[in-house]
């Protein structure tokens, strides 16, 4: 049996302020750092050990990985960072408060932008200061690879190449892997692993800082998955994510 652990980054400052974050490189709050340490403790208590980690190029995910591995005394493991694990790009919504945006456009429209499979938010202009094309961490990407906005379908399409070409082969070699990423990049992977329909993925919410363990067969098909930790706290965390766009 193969185990894979998925971990959404701890609470960021913009999570706390209920803003659309996307590719903006905001850091963790003190609570978010504590969530990451606690995630590490939960994984250590569960007997989990890792050989390698994959994360995005955004500091909230990187710092979550650092803190979790520090808690597990695994700071030495190999870490691979890729833009393909970034949060989905929220286009012109990045930086806006979710509740205020719901009051302006309506909760139903904002829910479509946040959770539908194939409807992206309004596009960002390349002249906008938020456009990531001038960021050196994306200097090796072609202009076509740098998004102006993304729906979940777009996020799935950019995530799956690194899954098929890099992560899955390591799992098949017996490597013990953790992926520390973002709400929507992890939703993209969960959709693929669990073969969730485009309609049902709307209702899937992934909380910050709580490890999600997948047990996979030799073909990397899920046998079961489960979150570590207190289940009542988990329910509250999932409900909190679901309620973020209420006006």
From Swiss-Prot:
Keywords: Gluconeogenesis, Glycolysis, Isomerase
GO MF term set: phosphoglycerate mutase activity
Catalytic residue list: 9 (tele-phosphohistidine intermediate), 87 (proton donor/acceptor)
Reactions that this protein is recorded to catalyse: (2R)-2-phosphoglycerate = (2R)-3-phosphoglycerate
Pathway: Carbohydrate degradation; glycolysis; pyruvate from D-glyceraldehyde 3-phosphate: step 3/5
Family annotation (Gene3D superfamilies): Phosphoglycerate mutase-like (3.40.50.1240)
Residues noted as binding substrate in the record, renumbered to the chain: 8-15, 21-22, 60, 87-90, 98, 114-115, 183-184
InterPro entries, alphabetized: His_Pase_superF_clade-1, His_PPase_superfam, PG/BPGM_mutase_AS, Phosphogly_mut1
The UniProt record lists the keyword Isomerase: yes
Domain of life: Bacteria
Site (Transition state stabilizer): 182
EC number: 5.4.2.11
Gene Ontology biological process terms, A to Z: gluconeogenesis; glycolytic process
Family affiliation: Belongs to the phosphoglycerate mutase family. BPG-dependent PGAM subfamily.
Record's function text: Catalyzes the interconversion of 2-phosphoglycerate and 3-phosphoglycerate.
Protein name per its UniProtKB record: 2,3-bisphosphoglycerate-dependent phosphoglycerate mutase
